Amino acid sequence: MRRPLAVVLGALLVPAALRAQGDTATFVLPNFHFADGESLAVLKLHSLTLGHPRRDASGHVANAVLILHGTGGTGRLFLNPLFTELYQPGEALDTTTHYIILPDDIGHGRSSKPSDGLRMKFPHYAYADLVTAEYRLVTEGLHVDHLLVVMGTSMGCMHSWMWAERYPDFMDGVVPLACLPTQIAGRNRMLRRMAMDAIRTDPAWQGGDYTSQPPGLRGAAEVLFFMTSAPRRLQRDFPTRDSADAEITRWMDHELATLDANDFLYQFDASRDYDPSRDLGRIKARVLAINSADDEVNPPSLDIMAQLFPKVPHGRYVLLPISDLTRGHGTHTVAAAWKQYFAPFVAGLEHSK
């Protein structure tokens, strides 16, 4: 999911050491076939990596961590200082001892996407295709044969559940941040549908063949703001009419400068095949699932985790109470809010190897 403006601005403040350490690469997959039968002659998958892989006595990679971004995001989101404290010496994902993989999914960032030129003729990918591409990037592009942890935020959170079920022996641990292990329905689906309809029903969209971004894109972005923002946090940070007006103006200006209507439609339509609820009992990896009480995308009042999480054989679920650290749905990128649970989880995985 796209980020609140405070998180977006923070992502621009990338520590120099990380900029110097990170390696970027584009992995090319020829003739990539999608689950619905469509194909793409050349699929480009971009990734950023931090640290270096380390192999154990058996020759398997032992320290790789795959971190998956949310809808509309990129791997560079995890260079945000709110998250990069995890990479510091002695921290849970210390980049001197871990190999961090930060991909851009299909349809996002520097990977192949509709706005590259195909527009609505781009294959209509779904989450299953994104996970397949992630796996091929890891195994064929980066030659990693095992992951210590698969973790992700929002859409990436959902992908982490899919990884746990599709590749149950490939990772030691899974950390889904800010999602539910069931199909997107109810208010969540309705808001997504409203956002997409704001574009599709705009005559200026022209079936995807627009020459400038259609005005309906603004309405779509406004729906996302309602969907992902945290009322308590916004009231605290913008307590006057003028400050609130200034913030929403800055946020909208940034969104409209970076969004593309066709990319947006593909990104939000891709969740149509997501529903890991039936196979939760088949997960072999240890799971640490984390949500926050002020997340309006996945509100705890739905009681979905209470119903489904007991099916996970080796799991722990943490619901973070509302605090000065939580930011609604965006809490997933605020490491300080949840690293007290994450750090011992990772340490436990490493000690059990």
Regions found by a protein language model. Name each.
Residues 315-353:
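Catalytic active-site module of serine/aspartate enzymes centered on a nucleophile-bearing elbow/loop
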Residues 48-116:
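N-terminal cap/lid subdomain of alpha/beta-hydrolase-fold enzymes
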Residues 146-185:
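Conserved hydrolase catalytic core segment
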Residues 283, 289-291:
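Short beta-strand/loop motif that positions the catalytic acidic residue
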Residues 170-254:
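Alpha/beta-hydrolase-fold enzymes
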Residues 296-303:
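Conserved alpha/beta-hydrolase "acid-adjacent" motif
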Residues 21-64, 75-76, 351-353:
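Catalytic-loop region of hydrolases
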Residues 91-141, 186-188, 192-207, 324-326:
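Cap/lid segment of the alpha/beta-hydrolase catalytic domain
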